From Swiss-Prot:
Keyword Iron: no
Compartments where found: Secreted
Protein name: Dermatoxin-J2
Organism: Phasmahyla jandaia (Jandaia leaf frog)
Predominant location category: secreted
Keyword Secreted part of the UniProt annotation: yes
Superkingdom in the source lineage: Eukaryota
Single Gene Ontology BP annotation: defense response
Length: 32
């Protein structure tokens, strides 16, 4: 169903966003 598909896409985007945020945080800490 479309709802399930969108939910899956949202989960994937959230996972990628978290990964990027973690990497960004590590870079900021390393730069200080």
């Amino acid at each position: 169903s479309l709802g399930g598909f969108l939910k899956g896409v949202g989960k994937a985007l959230a996972g990628v966003g978290k990964m990027v945020a973690d990497q960004f945080g590590n870079l900021l800490q390393a730069g200080q």
